[in-house]
Curated annotation (Swiss-Prot):
<dbReference type="GO" id="GO:0006325">
    <property type="term" value="P:chromatin organization"/>
</dbReference>
<feature type="region of interest" description="Disordered">
    <location>
        <begin position="160"/>
        <end position="220"/>
    </location>
</feature>
<feature type="compositionally biased region" description="Low complexity">
    <location>
        <begin position="160"/>
        <end position="177"/>
    </location>
</feature>
<keyword id="KW-0804">Transcription</keyword>
<dbReference type="InterPro" id="IPR013246">
    <property type="entry name" value="SAGA_su_Sgf11"/>
</dbReference>
<dbReference type="GO" id="GO:0071819">
    <property type="term" value="C:DUBm complex"/>
</dbReference>
<comment type="subunit">
    <text>Component of some SAGA transcription coactivator-HAT complexes. Within the SAGA complex, participates in a subcomplex of SAGA called the DUB module (deubiquitination module).</text>
</comment>
<keyword id="KW-0479">Metal-binding</keyword>
<protein>
    <recommendedName>
        <fullName>SAGA-associated factor 11 homolog</fullName>
    </recommendedName>
</protein>
<dbReference type="GO" id="GO:0006357">
    <property type="term" value="P:regulation of transcription by RNA polymerase II"/>
</dbReference>
<feature type="zinc finger region" description="SGF11-type">
    <location>
        <begin position="126"/>
        <end position="147"/>
    </location>
</feature>
<dbReference type="Pfam" id="PF08209">
    <property type="entry name" value="Sgf11"/>
</dbReference>
<dbReference type="GO" id="GO:0003713">
    <property type="term" value="F:transcription coactivator activity"/>
</dbReference>
<keyword id="KW-0863">Zinc-finger</keyword>
<feature type="region of interest" description="Disordered">
    <location>
        <begin position="1"/>
        <end position="38"/>
    </location>
</feature>
<keyword id="KW-0805">Transcription regulation</keyword>
<feature type="compositionally biased region" description="Low complexity">
    <location>
        <begin position="204"/>
        <end position="220"/>
    </location>
</feature>
Amino acid sequence: MSTGTANSAVSSKSTNSTTSTSKVPVNEKSNNSQNANTSTASIIKSYREIVNDPKNLDEAANYLYQSLLDDAVVGVFLEIHHLRKTGNLTAMDGVNEDESETSFRIVDMPNFDIFGISTAKKPMDCTCPNCDRPVSAARFAPHLEKCMGMGRISSRIASRRLATKESNSASSSSSSSYLQTTNAGSDDEDDVDWSSEKRRKKSSQNSRNNGSKKNNGKTF
């Protein structure tokens, strides 16, 4: 008895659950169907009102025609405008035989695109801040070094100039010292000559005095 009652309870629960779960989509489907029916009914009602009244029918027909015409014209206009801006309109139309000689031709040359524009990289020019001359970008750094005297060659030239200046200053100082020594030697020689002349004068005077004394002491 207990097993039978348990099975009956389980079966009753399952039937209740299935009935409860099956009720929800049925209600949703019914609601959706009701909404669809009401929308279709409203559309049919408005259509009958328009058809029954000839004035409304003309307005509806004109509105439908104008909307279709606007869509078609605007679509074509936008497409042509896009082709014109991108340059594809002439490609679609093509070139006449008479205009083929005067029109642009496709260029098939190295370093040129199909329009004949050079694709090679153009050398960029830079302005030297020291001499304000345009110099190519590849030669800007060595030119700036030479122009401002900061390169290796210019540093060597500057060191040579300094060496020559130092040698010139050293030679001038040595020549001045030599002139000073020669001048000092000439002064000493002049002093020696003057003293020797003075001694000679003194010796000649002494000899004269001695001779006069001897002559005075003689007896005749």
